[in-house]
A protein has these predicted regions:
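Conserved catalytic palm subdomain of right-hand nucleotidyl-transferase polymerases, strongest
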Residues: 132-145, 161-185, 325-328, 403-405
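Short, conserved non-catalytic motifs in the polymerase core
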Residues: 80-87, 136-145, 195-219, 318, ...
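Reverse-transcribing Pol proteins
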Residues: 3-153, 200, 237-242, 340-375
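A short, polar/acidic, helix/strand-boundary loop motif
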Residues: 199-217, 221-223, 314, 417-440, ...
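Conserved pre-motif C helix in the palm subdomain of viral-like polymerases
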Residues: 104, 169, 180, 200-234, ...
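Catalytic palm subdomain of template-directed nucleic-acid polymerases
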Residues: 145-151, 182-184, 231-267, 289-300, ...
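C-terminal reverse transcriptase regions that engage the nucleic-acid substrate
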Residues: 149, 278-394
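Active-site palm subdomain of RNA-directed nucleic acid polymerases
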Residues: 60, 215-264, 445-461
């Protein structure tokens, strides 16, 4: 079977001149007059041979060559007369839907079905707002997803990326244009990805946003890009379509950015230069985190700090809020507690207060939950910018001391270096749970030893509950 290369696809990404200096990488490369990037829809298909030459697996090459065939636990029912229509009564929303359908056609992501009498599985196309104020077309595949075979997989996380970045390193970032749409859909699977608008029927020819297997598929295919890179010169972190490159030298970082751009071009990947940052940096935002590699610190981004302050102020002005808003509050604060010193510790009273008044298993999202003065006191800490911006270390601390502690139902003891301290429990204390006694032993040991403030101390105890409690604040 021969594949026809869409016109212009070979110019999907144009690169800076060969002699481009890393220090000059400040603006997107100029396009050659008369040439334009080809449609992004299924744009990797004509480049399957280049992926094969790169060393990608036979499975990856097969998907790129013939398209991704949906894998089902159970074949979904097909219909000839679709009842689901994406046309809207609201003229403003309907205009947006029509524009997005045309945009998807222009991108080569969907095609019009000429034989409307052929059976297919139909879903609804709707719009969700993007960060830049535009709209993202999303096909509601929630019903179709129930028929798909589950694909568990591992992808980069905030924790895994932070664990591998280095203090003093330099980075650049690359963002792909309409990332999922790069991947073609197999001819026989397109009938399951149909949508109707009025009298017209369309089906996706490229991987749509909203398919439950899309993150797995995209991550598995794009991981092959690393085969064309030297891991000794560049560490590449791929968080779906957001990529971060790390080098230990600024000059090498600029050169490796160019190397990766050339590799993307050769593989048919379309880079979004407006969202990419090719200038080597040590202070940057990535996946919702502000990194300062010069000092080796992590911070909440400015946008996330404003989001925290906004919702906290709303709660401080209120006597009660619906459970839905409480969940939003805890979710927003919880998303930042990793980057705020003692953030988890400061969030605990708010979580406990909410769960004492409302239970997910029995309560409704609309239930009004009172805001106590104790909760407001805890929230007041979160509204202080100085508490949110000291930063947390990127790397694990270097411990100056190691403290060994132990406790029983009669007393406690600890030693650090050549110093030893111990004590007996009072009549009231012996009634406490052993986990509380083990934790209290650590506190008493630190007070008795009177260590200088600002030190990092490694505490060794045989109580795993206490270890977890301290590490998780």
């Amino acid at each position: 079977m021969a594949l026809e290369v869409p016109p212009g696809v070979e110019t999907a990404v144009l690169l800076p001149n060969e002699g481009f200096s890393p220090s000059q990488i400040q603006t997107p490369p100029l396009l050659v007059p008369g040439l334009a990037p080809g449609p992004v829809g299924a744009c990797l298909q004509p480049f399957w041979k280049e992926w094969q030459d790169l060393g990608a697996s036979d499975w990856v090459v097969s998907v790129l060559r013939w398209g991704y065939a949906l894998e089902f636990e159970e074949i979904p029912p097909l219909t000839i007369f679709p009842g689901i229509d994406s046309k809207r009564k609201d003229p403003v929303k309907d205009l947006m839907i029509r524009k997005e359908i045309q945009a998807l056609l222009d991108k080569g992501a969907i095609e019009e079905v000429q034989n409307k009498g052929s059976p297919g599985f139909y879903s609804l196309l709707f719009l969700v707002p993007k960060k830049d104020g535009r709209w993202r077309p999303v096909i509601d595949l929630s019903v179709l997803n129930t028929y798909l075979r589950k694909k568990p997989f591992k992808m980069e996380t905030v924790r895994s990326i932070c664990a591998l970045l280095h203090k003093g390193a330099w980075t650049f970032s690359i963002d792909l244009t309409d990332a999922y749409l790069h991947i073609p859909i197999h001819q026989r699977s397109r009938k399951f990805l149909r949508l109707r608008y009025g009298a017209k029927v369309y089906q996706f020819t490229a991987l749509p946003f909203g398919l439950s297997t899309a993150p797995w598929l995209f991550t598995k295919i794009l991981a092959s890009v690393k085969l064309g890179l030297d891991p000794n010169l560049l560490a590449l972190f791929q968080y779906l379509d957001d990529w971060l490159g790390e080098c230990m030298a600024k000059g090498m970082c600029g050169l490796q950015a160019q190397t990766l751009l050339k590799l993307c071009h050769s593989l048919g990947l379309q880079v979004n230069f407006q969202k990419s940052d090719l200038v080597p940096k040590q202070n940057f935002n990535f996946i919702g985190i502000n990194f300062d590699l010069l000092r080796g610190l992590l911070f909440p981004t400015h946008q996330n700090i404003l989001k925290v302050i906004e919702i906290v102020r709303m709660f401080l002005r209120s006597r009660e809020q619906p459970a839905r808003q409480w969940q939003s509050l805890i979710g927003i604060l919880g998303s930042q507690d990793r980057f705020v010193p003692w953030g988890r510790f400061r969030l605990r009273p708010i979580q406990l207060s909410f769960l004492a008044l409302w239970r997910p298993s029995t309560g409704l999202q609309s239930d009004m939950v009172p805001i106590s003065q104790e909760v407001k006191a805890s929230l007041s800490w979160w509204i202080c910018v100085e508490n949110l911006t000291p930063g947390v270390p990127l790397e694990a601390p270097v411990f100056q001391s190691r403290l060994f502690t132990d406790a029983s139902t009669t007393g406690w003891g600890a030693h650090l270096g050549g110093r030893t301290v111990q004590g007996q429990w009072s009549e009231q204390e012996v009634l406490l749970h052993i986990n509380i006694l083990e934790k209290r032993a650590i506190r008493l040991a630190l007070l008795e030893l009177a260590l200088p403030s600002g030190q990092s101390i490694l505490v060794s105890t045989d109580n795993t509950v206490v270890v977890y409690y301290i590490n998780k604040q």
